[in-house]
């Protein structure tokens, strides 16, 4: 084996190692974890058709578990301030159970992250396609979520519906 071939092989091994380390850093980064937490919340809020009560309560329970102790939810003009887990669960369940289908996509995500303090603010626009009793609709909302790192997980500390942008309400 020539010196040139050995150098190419070592260069390839080094490049693969650097790529794997970069991938690991990205996957484990707080930035990525916050975005995944939002993706999870959106997926749990969605539904494609009728749900049995056990599935509906299970999804509601999983959604409520994404909120930190001492959370605050503000969804004006649809709801007042919510700080109680049982009230939050009832509101989420009522909104989800009233819909035949909910599909959520988001855009314009902007994340501000302070790793040292373990806090983050994520603002975005949520586009919600819904079907309530055969009446399909689409609405868009500007949302701000303050996240807090709690026991290694990113949880919602403050959820605010900042602005209703367009469409009919799914609340």
Describe the predicted segments one by one.
Residues 28-42:
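Ser/Thr/Pro/Gly-rich low-complexity linker/stalk segments immediately outside membranes or between
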Residues 39-66:
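Short acidic-aromatic low-complexity motifs
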Residues 2-5, 10-11, 27, 119-121, ...:
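Short beta-strand edge/turn micro-motifs at domain boundaries
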Residues 10-25:
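Single-pass alpha-helical transmembrane signal-anchor segments
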Residues 77-79, 108, 124-128, 145, ...:
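A mature extracytoplasmic/lumenal domain signature
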Residues 61-79:
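Short, solvent-exposed secondary-structure junction/capping segments
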Residues 87-135:
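Surface-exposed, charged secondary-structure patches
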Residues 63-64, 71, 88, 122, ...:
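Hydrophobic pocket/interface hotspot
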């Amino acid at each position: 084996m020539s010196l040139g071939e050995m150098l190419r092989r070592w260069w390839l091994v080094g490049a693969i190692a650097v790529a794997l380390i970069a991938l690991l850093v990205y996957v484990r980064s707080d930035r990525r974890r916050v975005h995944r937490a939002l993706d999870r919340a959106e997926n749990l809020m969605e539904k494609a058709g009728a749900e049995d009560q056990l599935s509906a309560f299970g999804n509601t329970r999983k959604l409520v578990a994404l909120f930190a102790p001492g959370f605050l939810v503000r969804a004006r003009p649809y709801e007042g301030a919510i700080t109680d887990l049982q009230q939050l669960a009832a509101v989420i369940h009522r909104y989800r159970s009233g819909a035949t289908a909910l599909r959520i996509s988001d855009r314009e995500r902007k994340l501000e992250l302070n790793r040292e303090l373990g806090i983050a603010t994520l603002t975005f626009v949520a586009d919600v396609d819904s079907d309530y009793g055969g009446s399909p609709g689409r609405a868009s909302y500007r949302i701000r979520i303050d996240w807090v790192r709690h026991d290694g997980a990113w949880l919602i500390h403050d959820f605010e519906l900042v602005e209703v942008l367009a469409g009919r309400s799914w609340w």
